[in-house]
A protein has these predicted regions:
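Motif-centric detector for short Cys/His coordination patterns
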Residues: 1-82
Length: 82
């Protein structure tokens, strides 16, 4: 069986610092970025809600033209099934 690379195919803003993320395997995860924003200085700029909402999807979920990003695998493993 061929291994599937996990890719984000859609991400939707829910509220606060939570996104609903859909993967290429058909599964969805709710992921709250509150803890990451508070703990890791690189994510601190996302504490401004308008910046947090300005994400894009590439090979990762990213902000600020790739200056801030997070791997799909991390979201998948640490998010809650939606």
């Amino acid at each position: 069986m061929k291994a599937m690379f996990l890719e984000i195919i859609r991400a939707e803003y829910v509220s606060g610092y939570t996104l609903k993320v859909t993967f290429n395997n058909g599964e969805c995860r709710m992921f709250d970025f509150s803890d990451i924003i508070a703990r890791y200085p690189v994510f601190a700029p996302l504490g401004e809600t308008s910046r947090f909402k300005a994400f894009s999807i590439t090979d990762t979920l990213e902000w600020d033209n790739g200056r801030i990003d997070i791997a799909p695998e991390y979201i998948y493993e640490h998010g809650k099934a939606a």
